[in-house]
């Protein structure tokens, strides 16, 4: 029987700056998994799954939590649960993951139109940005009134200023709008800003809190909100095919980092990002946005830098990149930081002689690398995806 | 039995600049209606309906046409018919009617995401605008690849430059994208630019050609495309509830203006608009876009003009307005043009003393007029809708 | 320029038993149309459209009415308006038009699953039929709870017994379910049973009341319900592309028969159907259901009768048939009744020698007639559709 | 801080006859998990996930496989991937899980209507059942043509006769219809009938093969089909929120039983079921269908047995039941078999004195158990769901 076509064995995320989703389960997590509960979570009978849900809900000051296998699932069922009867639309940042990277779930599941807004300050949406794009429910039968504002914290690695969130929340309450947070990296926002999850919980009607990114769990997220909201979201989770059976092991492994000193782990990854940002600034390498937390976004357009060259320069130094976004996480080593500095500056120098104009909606160019890198070293095919 | 609560009798559109949909059936049309065929169009057995469909299809150089009761119906079933299997998205101008004023049909019927693009030149989308926002189908499972470009001609009253359309069409064909045209006012574009409908027909895979706006028919539009496209669109028309029975009278009345000198009628309405635009420019009243055809868009934001005051000033001179868009059509009189000049300049002067900052997505503010206008004259409630 | 490919001129519905939608506008209607109002109904400014809506609403004892271009449109927007947030399902008769002949609108517009029930008595659903198929909302996340019961009166020409409707209504109210009526032929039910429309209005939360079938109007229906319901339905009507402009003529023509002695007209058509039913029974020709009103359903399966032969036998006597359903309406002549008796009995005799077993979901076989009928007479291609 | 409200610790599935989803991970599986790969499966970089997918695909003779977190997810994305452009419908058994227990996914994700068919033989759909309910694509714009037949093997524990599947497949190919199999218990069908998975793979275009039911894995299923099909299904999996990161452990644990002697394990569970079926028959306790494999369906309606009493009688003997379906799996002990015999016969005797008429669409009554069982023993609340 012919051999399976298997990918190469994934050894470590220590040199993987493509995304913080590459964090790998630790030995401590594996040990914990052996003790996990074995109930069927669809029937609400798995202890560790319930413990995880209530732990994260309590941290966010919410009545209930729902374990979901991905952030896309928790975002999309949260938005669907807030929306009642169309025609309606949701408003979000034009870079929001719910709009750009969740494969049209908003249209398919929620039948929702989207008003994607470019922040006037370039970094995050202000209340004024929202008010000037919000579609009021004034009885106009042509329209699709805005029913929900979906924000992302962090977005593009930027920490959402708390006072702006408070202003937006007050206005939402006055206008009967729901406020959801894609908290794929809300742990990073909390760690960096010192704002406790509970305070974010007071602002947002629901938060999708990812576990498998900076927090290092194998899979999943927890969607938090009030009891009625989570009960209905559970129905949508089943409808989406997200109802899973013995999830105890996955829940127990996620609880390990939650019960550890996650703030220090995350702040370590932020420090690497801050250092790289300073390095770039010193070198005149333009960045897209302030590197508040674990991401550094190299402005490929302004630098006229070919993302494919950047990826290959990374490989030259045995560092994995996917494009303009450099994603630090707690498993990245200082050695990798030093190497990525070299890769970026060489790619920047290369761009000065070979300016590249990428004309696509995102700075990330699907890197169809050839067999040979710029320096002639053989490279296996890299399947890189947009961040 | 209590009397019905009926609206006031609508007498004439001569002074109605709210929209060109207010054009009223002419005596000639009424006469024609008496001779109309009486077959059941759902079974394809109504002569005048088939005659209208084939007349307009032939004018646009297309194989077939489908009579629809509204432009929203023909636009939405056209887009649905071009789209096969989600996840996908369509790309259009951020002001496009299919996106802003068709009550989320794109999400509900077609499960489509929308990439609304702000034209870099402020007037119409260039090929570069499209290429820099187009989502390629590169296998990225996060995305919703662009499958269709939907343009509008005219949009905001602006005639789409033919050469730009030709460039966009060539690129669409290279990239396997369909190109639809919301031709609510394509007659206006053709009349003003001299580009025959047939040439537009060569560029667009489908065109929704409205009959009830500048062309003065009571209801409807004709969706033109190839035979296979129209056959499938017929199925979606029935699904949307748009299959109608004895439509002969409506078809026959639409054919009257199509067989008349429609170009002169439209060019007359354009001349009124051009004259108003010049008047405004002379007075320093800012406009949003060039008044190529029958619309003049007063830039309420730049003029800091309260649309509600503008509407009431119009009523003072017995001219009906809905906000910043002044919509001429062939039934508007020169007398109305003179009166609307006065109304606009008084509203502009009023704004200099009472600057108004409208913070909404459209310049049109839903005019909740009081019982009394600015000059004390009693006014019945106006139900005005966004243009 | 080549001639248009036009269908033959449709002269009269006097011999057309395919469907009561073939009723043609009368001279009286054409006269009335000349006096019709000319306002834009999307803005609520057309007098005759508002008059039609309030007339029919008042007849049904409802707060408001909404003119729609087809029964499919009013049925589908009614059901969508009653449904709030999925997952949910509606329950109806397995032969219901909303389920079998509205091109999947329930799934596309309303995202609704359907529980189609076969009536235990073979004619209409009883409360027990409904209770034994109803999906309770008991928190089971696997299910799609029943939110709405959609009944049809008449269905298959059968008048729904009032007392059964009253029982079903009471149970619906106890269980928080909405009750919609597809009233494509509710006029026939009212005329035959003597139950006033107003009494049906007390039972059903909404009724889609067709105008273009037995009532002979060119197009449309009126959806009646409470004010809040109709306001939201208007939004869905626009979304479906059903918002039409100068609909005064169509409204005025519909009002003609409403203000005439429509009961006598309908009872005349019922009398023809009753006579044909008695004729069939006397001949041993099996019927599918009691011919309460204007339909006679020949049981093709039991009679082992080929619908294609029946259609062609009809043509032999210049009578148009589409299959097992014989649809009488007030424009059918007694002469046509006598001829269809001959056609049916000849087809029945033919079946005795050429038994035909149609194995399709409906008794109607899409009649791909050849150029020559059974008796050798040349026949134009008939495009017949399922009833 | 108040204690969490945790469910009781789930110890063993040995006495759990509610569903075979309650099978718990074995020590062997836990050991295997420790060696699992740690790549990110969204990027196709996890070795064990790819190995699982290719193992199951190869067993079913298919080009590719896709690991999904649930059978609902793999069923719904399979059906969506086969369907191109609505309006369309799918045809299935009225008891099919895709129709009754996947929370309206067919309407929400696929916009599909469903034709649920009652098998004429009471057990499984024959080709004739399908042909007499299939909606042909004959151009009828009222309809929603059948595009896909979704069968379930086993369904209701019944093994689908191979020759019937072969007949159905041939007819589907003639009529251009896709054929999907919900293989939640296809392992049971294969074990019992001796038909290899590969032969089922030749018949069905796609099969959703569950791992977490009789095969005992913690979560998931593998959807198998051709390469193009699986590539598109991957896009829908991401859209549904089913893209998960480090799934190596879950994949490795599923491979344990696949690489063990699963047939013996399953046949053991079947033997228990057969024994119970014989016991019931001997006692005159009516069954709904032949107990071919691991399920015994007590006909509650015919036995006039209250499912709530049955559940409580089970608890009296420390055996967990959810209603009429008794689900055996390889972790159930002979002791449990003996006890469930007692529970069922006592409930049956109880029914003779207290006949119960359950009037709901399914024989399973949501068991709102009181604090005390029929024999006075205190019982914790059971959250039982429909099978």
Swiss-Prot record, chains A, B, C, D:
Modification type Phosphoserine: residues: 367, 369
Keyword terms of this UniProt record: Isopeptide bond, Lyase, Phosphoprotein, Pyridoxal phosphate, Ubl conjugation
Cross-link Glycyl lysine isopeptide (Lys-Gly) (interchain with G-Cter in ubiquitin) placement: 228
Single GO MF descriptor: threonine aldolase activity
Enzyme class: lyase
Catalytic activity: L-threonine = acetaldehyde + glycine; L-allo-threonine = acetaldehyde + glycine
One CC-aspect GO term: cytosol
Residues recorded with modification Phosphothreonine: 370
Family classification: Belongs to the threonine aldolase family.
Complex formation: Homotetramer.
Additional detail: Present with 106000 molecules/cell in log phase SD medium.
Function: Catalyzes the cleavage of L-allo-threonine and L-threonine to glycine and acetaldehyde.
Protein name in UniProt: Low specificity L-threonine aldolase
Source organism of the structure: Saccharomyces cerevisiae (strain ATCC 204508 / S288c) (Baker's yeast)
């Amino acid at each position: 029987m012919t051999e399976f076509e298997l990918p190469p064995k994934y050894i470590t995320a220590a040199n993987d700056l493509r995304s913080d989703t590459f964090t790998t389960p630790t030995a401590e997590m594996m040990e914990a998994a052996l003790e996990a509960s074995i109930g069927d979570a669809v029937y609400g009978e798995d202890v560790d799954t319930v413990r995880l849900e209530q732990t994260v809900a309590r941290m966010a000051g919410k009545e209930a939590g729902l374990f979901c296998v991905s952030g896309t699932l928790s975002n999309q069922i949260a938005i669907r649960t807030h929306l009642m009867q169309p025609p309606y639309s949701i408003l979000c940042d034009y870079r929001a993951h719910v709009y750009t990277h969740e494969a049209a779930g908003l249209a398919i599941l929620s039948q929702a139109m989207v008003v994607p807004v470019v922040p006037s300050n370039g970094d995050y949406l202000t209340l004024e940005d929202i008010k000037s794009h919000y579609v009021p429910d004034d009885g106009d039968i042509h329209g699709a009134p805005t029913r929900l504002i979906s924000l992302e914290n962090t977005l593009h690695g930027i920490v959402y200023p708390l006072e702006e969130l408070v202003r937006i929340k007050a206005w939402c309450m006055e206008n009967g709008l729901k406020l959801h947070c894609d908290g794929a990296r809300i742990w990073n926002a909390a760690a960096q800003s010192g704002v406790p999850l509970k305070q974010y919980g007071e602002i947002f009607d629901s938060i999708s809190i990812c576990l498998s990114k900076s927090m290092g769990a194998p899979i999943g997220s927890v969607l938090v909100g009030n009891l009625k909201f989570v009960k209905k979201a559970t129905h949508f989770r089943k409808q989406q095919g997200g109802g899973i059976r013995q999830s105890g092991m996955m829940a127990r492994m996620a609880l390990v980092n939650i019960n550890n000193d996650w703030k220090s782990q995350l702040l370590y990854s932020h420090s690497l990002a801050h250092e790289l940002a300073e390095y770039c600034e010193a070198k005149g390498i333009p960045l897209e946005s302030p590197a508040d937390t674990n991401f550094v976004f190299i402005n490929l357009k302004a630098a006229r830098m070919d993302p494919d060259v950047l990826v290959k320069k990374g490989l030259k130094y045995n560092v994995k990149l996917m494009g303009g976004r450099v994603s630090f996480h707690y498993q990245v080593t200082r050695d990798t930081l030093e190497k990525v500095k070299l890769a970026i500056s060489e790619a920047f120098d290369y761009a000065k002689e070979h300016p590249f104009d990428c004309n696509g909606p995102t700075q990330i160019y699907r890197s169809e690398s050839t067999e040979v890198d710029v320096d002639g070293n053989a490279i296996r095919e890299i399947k890189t995806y947009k961040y």
